[in-house]
A protein has these predicted regions:
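Short, mixed-charge, low-aromatic patches
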Residues: 1, 18-23
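Regulatory and interdomain segments flanking nucleotide-handling catalytic cores
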Residues: 1-2, 41, 79-82
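Regulatory hinge/linker segments at domain boundaries
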Residues: 1-14
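Short helix-to-turn junction characteristic of helix-turn-helix DNA-binding domains
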Residues: 13-20, 67
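Basic, Lys/Arg-enriched C-terminal extension of HTH/homeodomain DNA-binding domains
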Residues: 47-83
Length: 83
């Protein structure tokens, strides 16, 4: 199954898993998005990774859990980018 995850999606999911806030993620080196764009990207990921019936009330924690379950991010290799 291809969820069409790009580099920025992976970085967003990885840093959410590490406990970064959206504001902290926007300040990462090479992350060309503001908070609104990060929120839009997060909502887009929710739409791609959850069925219509599962999407209600999905927060960042649940999104990260799904990404781990689908092996989009690897719990054993969660390293932050250089800031």
């Amino acid at each position: 199954i291809n969820y069409d995850i790009d580099e920025y999606d992976e970085r967003l999911l990885r840093h959410l898993a590490l406990g970064y806030t959206k504001e902290m993620i926007t300040n990462l080196k090479g992350m060309p998005f503001g908070v609104k764009s990060i929120e839009k990207r997060q909502n887009d990921l929710i739409n791609r990774l959850f069925t219509i019936n599962e999407r209600s009330g999905v927060n960042a924690c649940r999104l990260v859990t799904r990404a781990l379950e689908l092996r989009i991010i690897d719990i054993d290799n969660l390293e932050p980018d250089e800031e």
